[in-house]
Amino acid sequence: MSQSNIVRLDSRSNAQAAWQTLCSRADLVANSGVVAWHDGAQVALFHLPDNADGEQLFAIENRDPKSGANVIGRGIVGSLKGELVIASPLYKQHFRLADGSCLEYPEQRLQVWPVRLIGDEVQIAAG
């Protein structure tokens, strides 16, 4: 599996990963973030139902690397330089949703997880 956390939403199997249900589709907020616990980490989930590339779901670390605060799930989703990004609500740095890299500060990076929607379940790759 690549470093990207983009998984086709109609994908039902992946021999490389074991999937764990994290929450339900009803828990998601369109074009915004919600936060869930996964293996001791806070994971911010961003659901983009009407994106130009089709419905997409991203799972990215909730902890801002500059401040140490768990606030990424409260950030603003947007597009910058052709990339889908989340802007940290504190210092306004932009992180790519696809791979967690920071556009302004290359040394900052957020962890990402493969994630998918199967029916009404949001599943995240375990391990």
Residue ranges and their predicted role:
Residues 64, 88-91:
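Short cysteine clusters
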Residues 106:
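Active-site loop/oxyanion-hole signature of alpha/beta-hydrolase fold enzymes
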Residues 1-83, 96-97, 109-127:
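N-terminal pre-ligand scaffold of iron-sulfur
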